Amino acid sequence: MSKTHTGRGQRELRKTRRRFLQSIGVAGTVGVAGCAGSNKEAAVDDAGASTASDDDTTGGDSTTQTTESVEMTDRTFATATTNVPKDMQFNPYGQKYPDRAALALFENLLYVNEATSTFMPGVLSEWEIGDELVTLSVRDGYHWHSGEAVTADDVAFKLKLDIHDGATLSNIVDPEDVSVVDDSTLELGLKRPVAEEVFLYSLKPIALDTPPAEFQEFLDAYEADGEAPGLTEKTLDEPNGTGPFKFVHARNQELLSERFADHPDADNVNFAGMRWDYLQSNQKQWTALRSGNVDGIDNVFTPDNIAQSYGDDIQEIPMPANWGLGIMFNHEHEHYSQQKVKQAIQYVIDREKLARTAGSKMHVPVEVPCGLPGNFDDSYKDWLGDSLSEFNKYEPSTEKAAALLEEAGFSKQDGTWVDADGKTLEFPFKIPSGWNDWTAGGQSVVQDLNEFGIEASLNPSQSYWGDIYGNQEYVVAGLGWPDGKLYPYFSLNKLLNGFRSRGILKFPRSVEVPPLGEPNGETQTVELEPELEELAGLTGEAAKKKTQELAWIVNQHLPMAPLMEKIDQSWLTTDDWNTVTEEDVSAIVDWPQYYLPREGKLTAKPE
C-alpha cells in the first residue's frame, strides 16, 4: 500500500534537488533592488506534511520555513493571472476556467513532486493498487466551502464525471466500476493491470471541483444516455471550493480569496488570503515582480537580462517541465506524411543553436529524438540503457537531409526544394503568439530551413489553439512534444496513440518498423494501441524493454520532431515571506505558491 510518505530520506531529496539545479546551472536566487513586500497579489497559461530538512531554521530574517505553527498575520499573497478575473468561470469542463487559481481554491486528489516523481496526498490520504482493484482512502477533515464535509461519495462523483468526459483515467477504469465502500473509502475496478505510476499520474490533474449539487444533472445524463449536453456550457461565477483559500470576488482587475479555516492544513497558513492581479503579458509580470507589486508568480519565462535586474529578495525556483518545443506534422499533408521528409527536417535544424536562441539557461536541446523527456539530467538514458547507441541522434547534417529528400523524389530548383510535381516544399511554422522563447526559437528553426532551401516562415497566431484543436488548420506547428510527466509511458502514448496522435497529428494506427538498431533491416508491422496498452501495465525490466521498442518507433517515424526541453521558472519574494531554501526539494510541486502554504513552507513574516 502506498502511504502518505514515500520513505525517502531528506538528505537524498536534497541531493536530488542539487543534481537538478546543477544540471541547469542555476544558483536558485537572483538579485534586485529591494522593495517587494507589498500586500498586493496576482498567476499565468499537474501530502502529508513534509518534515523540515536538517538545516532548516526559523526566526529573524531567515527565509527558511518549517511546519511549526506561526503567528497569524493580515497579509495577502499577491500573484498574477493572464485571464480577466471577472470573466473566469469555475466549470472545469468549460471555457475560461482559471487553472492556476484553481490550485488554491480546490484540492487535488494527490500531488506530485516532479523532481523525484514522488506522489503525495491531497484529498486522498492512501492508495492500494492491485492487478484488478484500487482502494482509495479519503483524508479526514476536508470540507466544501459551503460547509459540508467531503466524503468518498464526492470523490466517486468526480471520478465518474471525469471518466465519462474522457479523462486519462477512462483508459483504465470504467465509470460503473467506481464504488463507495464507506464515507472514507472507495474502490475502482481496473480494465487491466497498470503500473502504479500510470494510475497515479492519471489522478494528478483531478481536483475536487465539481460539487454534486451543481453537476448532478450531467452525471445523470451520462449514465442515462452516454452524453451530457450542456456540460461545457454551464457557467459558475462563484465556486464552491475545497482548497485552503475561499473565493471572495472576481472583478475586472483582481480575483480575491480568503483563508478557509476548515481546511485540514489551515493551521499551516498564517496569512489572510491570496489575490490574483490581471497582468496579461510577461513584461507586466516582470515589472510587477521587480517593483514589489506581487509576492510571487507561478510560472513566467524570464530572460537572463530581466532576472539579473531583480534583487536579493526575489527567489527563483526552477521547475522541471518535462516539456518543450517540438514540431507537429500534419500527417494528412502530401509532404509531411512522408517519413523521409520528416527525418530531413530533423537533420536540418540545429537543436543546440535553437536552445541557445530560445534562452540557454532554461532550455536544452533534445540529444536523442526518441520521445523520452529527461534531457536536463540525462534520466532518459536510464530507460534506453545499452540500446542508447543504436538510436539516431539526428545531429545536424544538410548532406543527410538532402539525400533523404532526393530519395523521396524531391529536387532542388533555383535553390528551393520541390517535389516530383514541381510543388515547393513549404514550412509555414505556426506557433502561439506571445510566447517569447518560442518566437526566438522559431526564428532559429526557420533560418536553418530557409538556408537549406525549404521555404519556411514563422507564423505566430492569436487563433492558434482554435486552429490546431478546433479547425485543425495547419501544415506544421510548434507544440510541446512530451506530456509533462517524466515516466515514459505518457509521452510515448501522446506521440503514438493518444488524442494528439490520432486527432491532431493524424498519425497512422500501425507502422512499419525495422528491428531496433537496424534502420535498414526488414520491417514488421506494429499496431500501436495494443503496444501502448501493454506498456501501461509493465514494470521493471519488462517496462524498460518495451519503452526502448516504442522509443525506437518515435526515433524512426518522428510523429513529432522533438527539438528541446525547458525548465519552468517560478518566483517568490522573501522580504515579507518565509519560504524554502534551494536545497529543499518540496518546492518542486505545481506550483510552489499554491502547494507550499499547505505544508507550512510559505508563510508571512510578522508585520
Where are the regions that the model predicts?
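Aromatic- and charge-enriched surface segment that lines or borders ligand/interaction sites
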Residues: S125-G166, E187, H335
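Ligand-site clamp/hinge motif
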Residues: E233, L256-Q308, P318, N322, ...
